[in-house]
Amino acid sequence: VRGYMDAEAYALSTYQTASKLCSGGTIGAEASCNKIFWSEMDLLIHETAMDLLGARAEIEPQTAAEFAELGSWLDGFMFAQSGPIYAGTNEIQRNIIAERVLGMPRK
């Protein structure tokens, strides 16, 4: 349930950012918020899928039928691990939010 709710919240946040850009605005710290939210949501969704699939999650699909049934959750899970690191670590993104949104001093 949380993964679904997070995905819906992320979609709304993305729509808000796109709307702001379409109306001539610029984006700021909300890009950092979106990045953090997305990378943590991606981890949650893939961890949940791995838990639900159990040992089957570790088996790469060998046929089209297996791929249709299981997808490639293992690949997605492995890729999701890098989300909090690439495109600026989540720690850096949190510092940007602290400085630009909360007005805190630089670290």
Predicted regions and their residues:
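Alpha-helical interface subdomain recognition
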Residues: 1-107
